[in-house]
């Protein structure tokens, strides 16, 4: 009995030494912060301030163009533009998901998950990513035949995926509308009172938190016909026929991608990582996204001040007289820089942050909407000018900022400070993109 009393006293003593000892505020116990793993294929861009826009050294434009000093927080950025092979992983994921959805609808329940880990029913069933499609199964072939071109749409009886069906459904949370004070939850009345604007431009009353979740569907296959559509009276059929699927172009930047397709790619890439982290018991990190125009310019400068080009000086040739980017160097001459059209990413030297092709090769989408007066409207801390264009908006409202210049542009568009634009639903043979990811915590 005495030993039992001593044991109880010891337990009570040890308990008093826990996180609530003395009734003090000590925080929640058991939380573990792990260092952020550097994302594969990305380089770190530290936070800092710089002069956005042209500098005083650019005499031609210093008196007419807007510039201001801003600060940008640190982030990770893709070392190169997204390549054909990287984007193909996205396309193949969509093909696999659509195929499994068709098999589930065809009665093959092994391709779906109808119960969660607690035994609760899941409706509709979630796609089972671990299930494998058997290309030799005649039953599966019969169900999946509608995914391929049929009848007179086939070319020499080749079995080819109908790219018109490669639609990716994705969601995101509209924090901007959720942060509007008129849209906040009214605790006194125990309800929402505001209205929210959906992607189709329609306004509807806020029902609950789900009203701020946006749903979109985008066809993910690149517009391979852009090589012909972009240039009249120019023979570019070989690039249209082979550029995206031919292995020799795997390390070339993906083109023919609209802003919305690039946006969808970022959402898919985020979910790909989050699913992996969740399965391994790790906490999610910040999402992948397109860089803001300010982030892109800051990264292009490579930590230098007021430089005209990413390589640090005001010239497009090195000491040997060779061009140091892929662009249109001379009138009617595309080849003197070493590439007529796009070339493999990372061919030229990187800037001081280790980023390749921040000038030339292909121009790059950013997340910002294009407006000539945006510099005077945006904040000086992490400036960002966002606008989700509605289908009914005028074309000018659908413009997105494009940076860096491309293989078909003259040197002016290669400057760090020069933004231009393209319409968000337009695909070009000279526009690609790269992703960024915000840094977790401080430096």
Label every PLM stretch briefly.
Residues 97, 153, 163, 175, ...:
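Coil residues (strongly favoring Ser/Thr
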Residues 1-28, 33, 38-40, 299:
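Bacterial Sec-dependent N-terminal signal peptides
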């Amino acid at each position: 009995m005495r030993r039992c009393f001593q044991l109880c006293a010891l337990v009570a003593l040890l308990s008093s030494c826990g996180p609530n000892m003395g009734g003090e505020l000590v925080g929640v116990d058991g939380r573990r912060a792990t260092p952020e793993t550097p994302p594969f294929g990305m380089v770190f861009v530290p936070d800092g301030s710089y002069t956005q826009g042209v500098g005083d050294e650019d005499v031609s434009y210093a008196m007419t163009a807007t510039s201001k000093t801003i600060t940008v927080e640190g982030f990770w950025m893709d070392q190169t533009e997204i390549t054909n092979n990287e984007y193909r992983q996205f396309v193949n994921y969509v093909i696999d998901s659509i195929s499994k959805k068709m098999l589930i609808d065809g009665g093959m329940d092994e391709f779906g998950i109808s119960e969660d880990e607690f035994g609760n029913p899941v409706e509709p069933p979630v796609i089972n990513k671990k299930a494998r499609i058997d290309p030799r199964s005649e039953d599966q072939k019969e169900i999946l035949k509608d995914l391929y071109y049929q009848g007179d749409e086939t070319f020499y009886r080749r079995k080819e995926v109908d790219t018109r069906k490669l639609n990716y459904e994705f969601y995101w949370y509209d924090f901007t509308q959720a942060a509007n004070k008129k849209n906040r939850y009214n605790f006194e009345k125990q309800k929402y009172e505001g209205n929210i604007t959906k992607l189709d431009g329609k306004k509807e009353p806020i029902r609950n938190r789900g009203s701020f979740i946006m749903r979109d569907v985008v066809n993910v296959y690149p517009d391979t016909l852009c090589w012909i559509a972009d240039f009249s009276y120019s023979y570019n059929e070989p690039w249209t026929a082979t550029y995206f699927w031919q292995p020799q172009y795997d390390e070339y930047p993906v083109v023919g991608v609209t802003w919305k397709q690039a946006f969808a790619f970022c959402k898919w890439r985020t979910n790909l990582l989050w699913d992996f982290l969740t399965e391994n018991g790790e906490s999610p990190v910040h999402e992948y996204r397109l860089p803001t125009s300010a982030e892109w310019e800051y990264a292009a400068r490579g930590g230098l001040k007021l430089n005209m080009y990413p390589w640090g000086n005001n010239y497009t040739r090195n000491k040997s007289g060779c061009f140091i980017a892929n662009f249109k160097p001379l009138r009617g001459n595309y080849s003197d820089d070493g590439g007529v059209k796009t070339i493999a990413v990372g061919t030229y030297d990187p800037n001081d942050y280790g980023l390749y092709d921040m000038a030339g090769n292909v121009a790059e989408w950013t997340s910002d909407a294009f407006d000539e007066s945006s510099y005077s409207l945006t904040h000086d801390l992490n400036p960002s000018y966002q606008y989700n264009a509605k289908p009914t908006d005028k074309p000018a409202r659908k413009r997105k900022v494009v940076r860096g210049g491309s293989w078909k542009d003259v040197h002016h568009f290669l400057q760090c400070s020069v933004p231009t634009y393209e319409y968000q639903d337009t695909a070009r043979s000279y526009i690609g993109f790269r992703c960024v990811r915000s840094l977790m915590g401080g430096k």
